[in-house]
Design a protein with these regions (language model features):
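Tandem repeat scaffolds
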Residues: 2-9, 15-164
Length: 164
């Protein structure tokens, strides 16, 4: 009887090993999943939301000031007129995102992905784009308005973009 019990426990253990929990399930519990959501005007300021998912969400006028969003996913999101002042967006995926009239002042955007994103009338004073993935046209556009030094990293916005 004891051997049968041990065999069952061993079998269950091996089955669990064969079907591990997906990495996204352990890294991103449900409270950090906001994809495909209407989040206009929501206040996320001063929150710690690393690896949160906001893909395909409308976050117009949302407040992410002083937010830790390291590794967050905003792909194909709408951040029109949103405020991300002093937010940490290191390693964030911000591709195909609309930043029209958004405020990225003093944000840390190190190694963030911005391909296909739009920056019409976006505030970037003091933002650190070090090693961020931007296309040439985005860099030209941002260099025209780049100014300031990031208060967290000490890097100038112009230097982080490689402006001449």
């Amino acid at each position: 009887m004891i051997k049968l019990g041990r065999s069952i426990i061993l079998t269950v253990f091996l089955v669990l090993l064969a079907f591990p929990v997906p990495s996204w399930a352990t890294k991103n519990p449900a409270h950090l999943f906001f994809s495909h959501s209407l989040l206009q005007g929501r206040d996320f300021s001063n929150q710690s939301l690393p690896a949160a998912e906001f893909a395909n969400s409308n976050m117009e006028l949302a407040n992410f000031d002083h937010c830790d969003l390291e590794g967050a996913i905003f792909s194909k999101g709408i951040l029109t007129k949103a405020s991300l002042k002093q937010a940490n967006l290191t390693y964030a995926m911000l591709d195909q995102t609309d930043f029209t009239e958004a405020d990225l002042s003093d944000a840390v955007l190190v190694e963030a992905l911005f391909l296909g994103s739009t920056f019409h009338h976006t505030k970037i004073e003091g933002a650190d784009f070090t090693d961020a993935l931007l296309d040439r046209e985005q860099i030209r556009q941002l260099c025209r308005i780049a100014s300031g030094i990031n208060s967290t990293t000490g890097i100038s916005t112009r230097d982080s973009l490689g402006c001449r």
